[in-house]
Swiss-Prot record:
PANTHER family: 16 KDA PHLOEM PROTEIN 1 (PTHR46502:SF15), C2 DOMAIN-CONTAINING (PTHR46502). InterPro entries: C2_dom, C2_domain_sf. SUPFAM superfamilies: C2 domain (Calcium/lipid-binding domain, CaLB). Phosphorylated at Ser-44 by CPK18 in a calcium-dependent manner. It is found in: Cytoplasm; Cell membrane. This is Elicitor-responsive protein 1. It comes from Oryza sativa subsp. japonica.
Amino acid sequence: MAGSGVLEVHLVDAKGLTGNDFLGEIGKIDPYVVVQYRSQERKSSVARDQGKNPSWNEVFKFQINSTAATGQHKLFLRLMDHDTFSRDDFLGEATINVTDLISLGMEHGTWEMSESKHRVVLADKTYHGEIRVSLTFTASAKAQDHAEQVGGWAHSFRQ
């Protein structure tokens, strides 16, 4: 798979998060998400006082260059609890394999994974809630032009 494009991540919300705040009320967490694709990171806003069921409705974009990347394409969603007077607490992580999304986007120009829920887990795979996102990959015009010039499968299926 060769080419480049943009991976758009729509961070919707999370449900049933469990926190580690020992000093505050149980469930009194201020969650945010660090979205990571390879070396690129984006950080959501802090959902202050939203506790276990935060809502963000934010969109993040990542530049994808699949010619330099081999193997699996994974998106990591690391959920954190913002603490004012101490280090932020790790709430859990969700991992989404986006390899097929990128492949289909390269082939068709754009491809979408509709809103879906993903398990938030700790390192030992203990369930800590769920997060809801939708994803869209759009191939760059240069990648699409290359597919048309080469002909092959992408070209032969057009009607």
